[in-house]
Amino acid sequence: MKIEIMLKKLKVITNVFCVIALLTGKSFGQINQSKINKSDFTDPYAVFSNPPEAAKPGVLWMWMGTNLSKEGITKDLEALKNAGFKRTTMFSLSDITTPWAADIKNSPTPNIISWTEPWWKLVRHAAEEAKRLNMDFGMFNGPSYESSGGTWITPELSMQEICWSQNLVSGNKHISLQLKRPQVNPRANQSFPHYNPNTGLFEKPEIEARKTYYKDIVVLAMPAKGIVPENKVINLSKKMTPDGLLEWDAPEGEWTIYRFGHTTMGALIQPAQWEATGFECDKMSATAVEFHLNHVITETQKYLGDLIGTGFSHIHFDSYEAGVPTWTPKMREEFKNRRGYDATPHLATFAGRIINSKADSTKFKNDFDATIKDLYRDVYFKTIAKKLKEANLDFLCEPYGGPWRQDEIMPLVKNVMTEFWTTNGTYAPYELDPTVAALRKSGQNIIEAEAFTGFPDDSKWSETPAWVKPIGDAAFCAGVNRMILHRFVQQPWNDKILPGATMGQWGTHFDRTQTWWKNGMPALVKYWQRCQALLQWGNIVPTFADDFASENIEGKPLIKSIHRKSQDVDIYFVANTCHNKAIVKCIFQVAGMQPELWDPVNGNARSVNSFKEKDGKTIFDLEFDDAQSYFVVFRNKYVKPINPIAQNFSTKKEVLKINSTWKVSFDSAWGGPVKPVIFNVLEDWTKNNNLGIKYYSGTATYHTSFDFKTNKKSDDTSSLYIELGEVKEIAAIKLNGKDLGVLWTAPWSVEIPAGLLKEKKNQLTIEVSNLWANRLIGDEQELDDCEWLKGQMGDFSPGHKAGSYLKQFPDWFVKKQPRPSKGRYCFTTWKYFTKESPLISSGLIGPVKITQR
């Protein structure tokens, strides 16, 4: 969750795309409906049709402050299991993450403080449930998600910074001078402001230890002006008493006396509950790192010991935002051992002085930085890897953003994770490409990503599976093959409290309280499982200019691809990563093989029968709907068919438009009409005059009846499809009592099994789920029965609309009384909308048709 640099680079990273060479050509084909004999499929199809455990995605599970419950934990894990997830990594955060460490007053469960016994009991319950459900459960290495520390870290074990005071004196006499102790800004030297409950301000809080904790390093005297030869730097440390009194016979000339020391940076872990907030440990001190890890492991073993390796499996370290320290107690000896010379005379470069020459001072700074990188590797990361291995815990990490060499760290980590965001609805990688490149080089096959981290502009209970699909597809094409979703929030309350808890303003709302979770999430996860199964199979083929090329024939797609290979099998994932239809000529660096087209949305597979070969390449057209993707698989030698079929994609023929009336049932618990409503014509709910429909959020059930008379001949091998037209946002279809599945992305159609249609009274039922946004906006038309405070994003993200957070849990909520505002239905901890916010199109808009292909 790299907030700081990510925010600085938004305009750059939104323009980072996979490079695909473009070649010219013209072609257009039609669908061939001949089926592949699935018994002929070898290993790739086995994992595609039945994805293994390794292909299942995971989530970052956010426990927000005191808002936790056993019942909610069980429901969360069961929902994840049923949807097809495998791993969950828990973070224990503040009630609200922006402002950092903000709390919501009047909590129903105020005693649940991170890393205290009531909290650990809930962690144990989660581990027991994970074991029961055969899920992989672990957690971050302390409170917060940044970076490694807690209340147990004292000032001397915290991250350190060098500081100094200076005095100008004239020589040729005895100097008796009280040297001032170096002073630093008492406010924390950290990346982001905190909400400080002691002052009520959003600030970098004053740290008492930055006023009181100090250790001397050295006292140096040198000529007051100009470049200073190293032999003119005089160490006066032995001439200063412990209380800072200097007694020195100064040579002739003007001298500057520097008193160098170090103090705590005051860097605090973020964003944790205020009661659980403490210092970041010194990452360059073996004493501090071991102390932190011993505390983490000892507490984990105390409460979860018998579950380690079964219900509890890993400790996570997130992307680094703790700042760069400039000192550690053993820095001088570490520097000399690693760089071969004494750093002491050169410390004045921190005060802006030049020692020997500009080149020498530059070299010293580079050597000093290199020593910091060495210590992060040898002290911090190697100690983590060693300690966790000894404790039988896996080491998970996002190894970027900090003062180290990334390629040296990744081999120490069991599961390396990279990161991508959603920015203005597009794929926005952060440190993804270099991480993937380094992982490929090291031979690691599984490339995980913190996936879909989002700003409130995009992520405000308005996300859909169809919206996230092309963003995830772009990440797949960049090399990611295991999604770890950001984020899934622990929902502690009963199922009437919806949409419930949030991570403040951050992240895509992959929560079990989503309107579309029941029908949409299993379908989306199955898609990811199929993709990840094939994207983990074999090895990535290094990218080169003509490995895959495409030329747009119709439309304006953004085509991305990735190529994997194992022995004689080539697998290409080809994705249209924008919401445009297109026909694209595709050129693959394969010859003599039969191309096959596998659809990860529905699991269907078929041969490509119309293609040509030229110069060792296979060439054919692909027809893409909005954000559609395919796997193109070459695994069998090409054998020329006896009766060749010249077309790959066929035009569809409309055989019936369903114009009958629809009976639509809404859930009155969320403001919908109590009785079913007749729709003579399908329409957007937001255009309806009935406010219960206009502002409705949730699932509504459409039902209609229609007659159908087929003109198909007995030898006609074409198939019939139900086409839904425009759907906002998820549709689960039943025809004559048979479940035809869930539609969540284009093309919005499903094949009708042979023999299912009748001539008379076909019964069609469609469950349609929209988004929470409209009900939340509808609630804003009513009197508010909660108090809100403005969300703070700070100066580091200008232009983003944050929203407001709940000031306190209202008494009616805590006491489980009827809410005062009868026209309100939703309850959540973050407000994204006002009464003027635009509604989002909803419902089955159609037209609904039967087509033949």
Residue ranges and their predicted role:
Residues 587, 706-708, 712-736, 743, ...:
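Aromatic-lined ligand-binding clefts that engage carbohydrates, nucleic acids, or primary amines
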Residues 57, 73-74, 87-88, 108-145, ...:
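Carbohydrate-binding surfaces of carbohydrate-active enzymes
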Residues 1-34:
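Bacterial Sec-dependent N-terminal signal peptides
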Residues 210-211, 215-303, 612-654, 759-761:
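Extended acidic/polar, glycine-enriched regions
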Residues 93-239, 248, 269-270, 276-277, ...:
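Acidic/aromatic-lined carbohydrate-recognition and catalytic surfaces
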Residues 40-87:
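Mature N-terminal segment immediately following signal peptide/propeptide cleavage
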Residues 145-148, 152, 168-170, 183-216, ...:
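An acidic-aromatic loop/edge-strand motif
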Residues 610-612, 740-744:
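Short beta-strand segments within Ig-like beta-sandwich modules, predominantly Fibronectin type-III
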